[in-house]
Amino acid sequence: VKRRVSYPAWLKRSLVVITAGFIGVNIMLPPPMAEAEKSSPVVLDKDGQWLAGFTIDAGTWRIAADLDEIDPRFTQRLIAIEDSRFYTHSGVDLPAIARAAQSWKRAGKAVSGASTITMQLVRQIEPRPRTLPSKMIESARALQYELYYSKDEILEMYLTHTPYGGNVEGIYAATQTYFGKTPEYLTDAEIALLIALPQAPEARRPDRNPDMAEKGRNRILNKLASEGHITAQMQAEAKEVLLGGSRAPIPEMAWITAYGLAADSGPTQTTLDIILQRNAEQIASEFAKKLPGPVNTAITIVDNKTLKVRAHVASADRQRPGGWIDMTDRPRSPGSTLKPFIYGMAMDDGLAAAGSFVHDAPTRFGSYQPENFNRRYHGDVRIFEALRHSLNVPAVTLLDQIGGQRFENSLKSAGVDVTRLGAGGEDAGLAIALGGAGLTVNDVAVLYAALANGGKAAPLTWKPNTKTIATRMMTRASAGEITKILRQAPTPDGRVPAWLVKNAPAISYKTGTSYGFRDAWAAGYTDDWTVVVWVGRPDGAPRPGETGRLAAAPLLFDLISALPHSGTQSHFEKDAAAPKGLQRVSAQETRGPQILFPPEGSEILAEDLGASSRGFSLTAQSETGKVTFYVNGKPVPKDSGRSVWRPEHSGFYNVTAVDGNGLSAKSRVQVLTFDDLANAEL
């Protein structure tokens, strides 16, 4: 029969008191979990790449560690050096304490330490003087931490708080600062240095004391080799690595954007793409160097298929006046960038079609009388011409029929926050067509992405797994017509038209200039991307002569050309299929003339005008060989056997070619002068 062991009553009472006391202290004085888990906010791209980070606690870099993203050889060797029984003790290593006490007794001073990784973590979070009472408190706290956290969580917190010299804490900040990389893949020399540094963080800083850092590193290499963790060859090769040099900068891409998206602590993943972000920032920075000091630019780039923001430049240069302001989020007058949506809504209402005519002449709408940008008028023009050349009066005419408030409501239903810049009332409502209301760069990106998506608008997304609801702004057919018109807009000066460049994406775009030349805009899209550019002064000061076409469109085209494209390269729509029941036939026996110059929809630059000008030689191809030209119904006279047309003024003209069989061909063209180009707003 087993004899029952009986313990003294005083021992039982003591155990109860000690247990109750520990539980009471644990409840009343829990470990500072908030401080233990606090780390620098870090913003990541869509694939987890580091875009930017922010310091905490008087400028400290402390990046949260993740064991899955740290070289496992580092953690194995760290534990071997610092706390070989880490995974078996409960926060306090009693054999290590006994060994340290015996060493101290023999040598008369501390020879080996007894602090576990958990105790070191306690000291990092709650610094205390190096005294015996402090050691006892640290031991108690270590036991607490072991109750609250798993071993891996403790190790991650330790690798988050470990000091590495200066304002650097944690393995992530250390590898970024001293090696310019993450801790996922480390060399033997780097591992040894990272183990040696926390033992004397300031004395062994490689950027300030490379000799001391090398001695500490080599001491760790010797110990690792003696204990069989590395070979003699690995030891020798690691010792050959030189130390020194300046600290690598912490990444700060999309800095202003990241600041707005970052959580209070720890990592925040975004939809940004680090490669596209880097390209956009470089292009914007080079562009900004050519701008006067107070002028800046802002950019939003959106993936049309997902509406995720892939690149975002809140300010091209933070060192300029107002450079710390996110100019993509500030309401500014959008100029003419809303005109495509007026025409699209008019098409939906049956008020207009791409080829229908609208009158362009001085017109008063109540007390509001808009003017064209260059104060010239063209009479009856087709809708596609009015939009392509950004005529003001036709846009306001259609908006008056649609209703200014109704149009504004359609923008708001798409998620766009319309800000009135002037006084309310009917006049302000119609003025929205010409920039009389404030929109942000991000708002304009929502609208143009809707055109790219067949008329469906939805909010932009900045973080993964964000759910949004789409709203139809216009029918797919109307969005397609608008896209076709904007796709045929002339490219910025000095650029080869995209349709002449192999594999160049088909770009639909519109520019805008606010009243007083305060804001220059360019918004464009391809099948894959929507890009919106703003250029101006953050203080809203005017920049005379700086239109959207001159100041913003070149940057838009630079950005789009740097993006990857997988969509259509088609620049002009094919003829629509014949309605059901009809058949396309080709008249092979008798073909009418074909106008070679000027082609349909072309713009012709005239050096001079009138009867004394050089004029333009009109040419056509015809089976009869004989062609007579008419411009606006009047015959064009012959000059040395050629039909030479000498326009009297700039504007739109109808050119007709009639052959010997009486068959004809027509083209509608616009004549421009150098003055027109100087005052152009497209």
Regions found by a protein language model. Give the residues of each.
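Soluble, non-transmembrane domains of envelope/secretory-pathway proteins that act on or interact
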Residues: V1, I23, I230, A238, ...
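Residue-level preference for non-acidic, small/hydrophobic
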Residues: G48, L78, L121, I154, ...
